[in-house]
Structures are given as C-alpha cells and as structure tokens.
C-alpha cells in the first residue's frame, strides 16, 4: 500500500514572482542589431549572433547544406584547427554553440563576464574566418548521412516528414527534411559549404 493518494493531485506551491529584465536594443556601427538583457545576479555573458542564412534559403537540390555548414563551423578557422579552437574555448571556460534552422543560423558563446573579450574574439574568428577543412566537412557529412539514414527508420521522423510534405506546397523548403536527403548531402563538396 502506498502512502500517496494518487486519486488527488498534489497541492501546488506558491507561484514565485519573476520579473523579466528589460531588453535593451540598439545597433552596431556595421548595422548588426543588438539586444541586451541583463541578469545582474549571474556573472555569465551569452552572445548570440543570428545570421539570415538558414536551410529555407537554399534551392531544393542543396537541401541540408546549411545544416552541414553550421555543424562544420566548429571544425576550425584560418588561424587554428578544430582541436586548437576547442582548447582555446575550454581554456577560458567558454561554450560555443551553432544551430541552424529554417530561417537562419545562430552562433553563440557563453562565458564568465571577465573572459568576454577573449570569447568574443573567438566568436568573431569562427564567424568571419572559418576554414572548413576537407577532413572536417567529410566527417560532418558522414554524421549527417548517418542521421538521415537513422531518420528513415524512425516512425516519428517519417510521420513528421510526411506531414511537412503534405502541409507545404511542393517546392517550398519547409516541405523537405531540414537535414536534407542522402542524395543532396552525399554530393556536397567543401567548396559548396
């Protein structure tokens, strides 16, 4: 016998007050939009750069290329290879993230506030001076192909892809899988990334 009466929902606790901080907006001299949200209790800074270069901007034969490009960004820059980049980030306690969606690619870095200048320099290096070494592009391509093959055996992924195909008009990027197809990804070259 259980001590809990599962026929009755548990009593909820008091709702805690949360005052979301004001978002300040501005623009950098180069035209980039700037949004700042300060949480003074945390000594952490997160910088998120959003590029309007997503999967939705690609023609059908190049499906999945934006995702592959985003995933390969962490593979190195013109100044350092992927291992050196990872070591530089780890050395300052920073975390780099890249995420590609339909509308754009987000490149972000999170770090303690006193290490922001170094982290920001690394973010700029990754964004402005990517190298896309062939070995890294090949590795990411193989990972993406494995994901595509795995999705072909996943009923949930197949259902989602079918809903998208039926919901969106033929030829729209949203009607195809965001990660691409085996034929579109297997033919991607380093020069196309």
PLM features per residue range, with description:
Residues 94-102, 116, 132-138, 158:
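Short, flexible active-site-proximal loops enriched in glycine and acidic residues
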Residues 75-79, 110-143:
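M16/insulysin-pitrilysin zinc metalloprotease superfamily fold
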Residues 1-7, 76, 119, 151-192:
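Scaffold signal of the M16-like zinc-metallopeptidase fold and its non-catalytic homologs
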Residues 41, 46-113, 153, 176-177:
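M16/MPP (pitrilysin/insulinase) zinc-metallopeptidase core fold and M16-derived inactive scaffolds
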Residues 66, 82, 86, 120, ...:
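Hydrophobic face of alpha-helices
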Residues 69-77, 93-96, 127-134, 148, ...:
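Sec/Tat-exported extracytoplasmic proteins
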Residues 31, 49, 67-69, 89, ...:
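Buried hydrophobic packing residues in well-ordered domains
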Residues 1-36, 44, 48:
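Proteolytic maturation boundary segments
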């Amino acid at each position: 016998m259980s001590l809990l009466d599962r026929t009755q929902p548990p009593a909820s606790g008091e709702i805690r007050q949360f005052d979301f901080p004001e978002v300040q907006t501005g623009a950098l001299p180069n035209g980039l939009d700037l949004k700042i949200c300060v949480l003074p209790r945390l000594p952490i800074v997160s910088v998120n750069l959003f590029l309007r270069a997503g999967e939705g901007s690609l023609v059908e034969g190049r499906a999945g290329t934006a995702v592959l490009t985003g995933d390969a960004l962490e593979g190195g820059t013109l100044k350092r290879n992927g291992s050196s980049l990872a070591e530089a980030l780890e050395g300052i306690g920073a975390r780099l993230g890249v995420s590609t969606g339909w509308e754009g690619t987000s490149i972000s870095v999170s770090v303690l506030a006193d290490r922001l200048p170094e982290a920001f320099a690394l973010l700029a290096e990754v964004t402005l001076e990517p190298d896309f070494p062939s070995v890294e592009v090949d590795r990411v391509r193989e990972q993406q192909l494995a994901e595509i093959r795995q999705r072909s055996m996943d009923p949930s992924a197949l259902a989602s892809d079918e809903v998208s195909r039926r919901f969106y008009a033929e030829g729209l990027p949203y009607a195809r899988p965001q990660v691409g197809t085996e034929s579109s990804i297997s033919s991607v070259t380093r020069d196309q990334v």
